[in-house]
């Protein structure tokens, strides 16, 4: 079995204080995939104040793909971990940290430690291209989420 480990990272700016952005990011909902532009649904099970199990079903290329994820939330540090228990990225870990940028703005720092299981080992060039494409996809999705955050949180302030 071939196992490929890839690390990638990006950041996403938010026009909201860090605590408010962190709270929004960790408030999981069955409709989250719609916010990211995905066709799919999510089952959210709150195990404890700092632990959530997500069961996501998505439809890339029209075929159902289900992933189960363990989320660990550290509100004091404004960090959370997303560990994939099942699916094509089984045993992958994603780390999120919301950092204050003054009193009214913040940014999300994201690092993905992703495992994939291809039939054949990719070349270094293929690995680099995959990491770049994955980061671009996640950046695009987080851009959509930032816009959704803007709509929801600005609406609450009005």
Task: Label each PLM-derived region with a short phrase.
Residues 15-19, 46-49, 72-77, 97-107:
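A short, structured loop/turn motif at beta-sheet edges
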Residues 1-51:
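Hydrophobic ligand-binding cavity/cleft-lining segments
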Residues 20-25, 70, 108-110, 145:
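Hydrophobic pocket/interface hotspot
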